């Protein structure tokens, strides 16, 4: 099991790194006192956590490096600690603090920002010197840092993107969480068949009705082709979800069928897919 210890100078991106690690499946704890590391690791080992990450900053640094080393030696045998240290040049840190107007953790000790940054560097040097990976974030954006961590730790640039296909009825309103909205009200409507009206797009007779129409096939094919074309770009855009909303008049027949067809297609391509049907969920 991996225990990633994230440290670095304030303003270098520790919070960004911790969020990126959480997206990668790490159990994350922010600002954990060093002497609690063994206890946390033991608890996570009992819960079969595959990977964990903790951040340590200047506020919870031990008084001597020996305390940190002792904490690492006390970790359960199944944990492999790795130390990630984030840094940035002095001018970049000053600019970031100026932009965010936040106080440096050591500014409470009546130090100027410049002196606080320099003092922090000295206090964190024992951690920096034993780091397994040092990343200089001076020229990085938030997204670039997250991307680098995924590349270094997972061997891939994109995070696991979850595609969500949801059906809805326009008469109930457009979902506010949708990234893409497709209108299928022009497709043949099973509602006008008295036998199909009580059914939904999940029922075989409705699916058979829609499957007989060429325009339905063409719409599904062109929609999935559009999504396939841009999916690689979306996967590298630092997002966790892509929500595709399919709407018909009532959200009961056409939109449900089309959403399921698209979900099945991308699921068969190995994508992480969810489907939901807003109108049908309201009826339960």
Swiss-Prot record:
Disulfide bonds: none annotated. ATP binds at residues 8-15. GTP binds at residues 57-60. Pfam families: PapZ_C, RapZ-like_N. Keywords: ATP-binding, GTP-binding, Nucleotide-binding, RNA-binding. Signal peptide: none annotated. Residues 267-284 are annotated as: RNA-binding. It comes from the Bacteria. GO terms for molecular function: ATP binding; GTP binding; RNA binding. Transmembrane segments: none annotated. Belongs to the RapZ-like family. RapZ subfamily. Homotrimer. Modulates the synthesis of GlmS, by affecting the processing and stability of the regulatory small RNA GlmZ. When glucosamine-6-phosphate (GlcN6P) concentrations are high in the cell, RapZ binds GlmZ and targets it to cleavage by RNase E. Consequently, GlmZ is inactivated and unable to activate GlmS synthesis. Under low GlcN6P concentrations, RapZ is sequestered and inactivated by an other regulatory small RNA, GlmY, preventing GlmZ degradation and leading to synthesis of GlmS. This is RNase adapter protein RapZ. It comes from Proteus mirabilis (strain HI4320). The lineage of its organism: Bacteria, Pseudomonadati, Pseudomonadota, Gammaproteobacteria, Enterobacterales.
């Amino acid at each position: 099991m991996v225990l990633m210890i994230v440290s670095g100078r304030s303003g270098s991106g520790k919070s960004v790194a911790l969020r990126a690690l959480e997206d990668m499946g790490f159990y994350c704890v922010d600002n954990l006192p060093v002497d609690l590391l063994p206890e946390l690791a033991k608890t996570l080992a009992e819960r079969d956590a595959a990977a964990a990450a903790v951040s340590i900053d200047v506020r919870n640094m031990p008084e001597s490096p020996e305390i940190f080393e002792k904490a690492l030696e006390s970790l359960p045998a199944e944990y492999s600690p790795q130390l990630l240290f984030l840094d940035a040049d002095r001018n970049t840190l000053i600019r970031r603090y100026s932009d965010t107007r936040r106080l440096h953790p050591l500014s409470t000790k009546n130090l100027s920002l410049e002196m606080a940054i320099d003092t922090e560097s000295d206090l964190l040097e024992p951690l920096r010197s034993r780091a397994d990976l040092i990343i200089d974030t001076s020229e990085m954006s938030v997204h670039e840092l997250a991307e680098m961590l995924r590349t270094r730790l997972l061997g891939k640039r994109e995070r696991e993107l979850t595609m969500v296909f949801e059906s809805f009825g326009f008469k109930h309103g457009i979902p506010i969480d949708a990234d893409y909205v497709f209108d299928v009200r022009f497709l043949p409507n099973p509602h006008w068949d008295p036998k199909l009206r009580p059914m939904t797009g999940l029922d075989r007779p409705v699916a058979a009705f829609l499957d007989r129409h060429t325009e339905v096939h063409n719409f599904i094919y062109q929609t999935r082709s559009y999504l396939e074309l841009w999916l690689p770009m979306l996967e590298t855009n630092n997002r966790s979800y892509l929500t595709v909303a399919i709407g018909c008049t009532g959200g009961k027949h056409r939109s449900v069928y089309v959403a399921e067809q698209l979900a099945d297609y991308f699921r068969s391509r190995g994508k992480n897919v969810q489907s939901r049907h807003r109108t049908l969920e309201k009826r339960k």
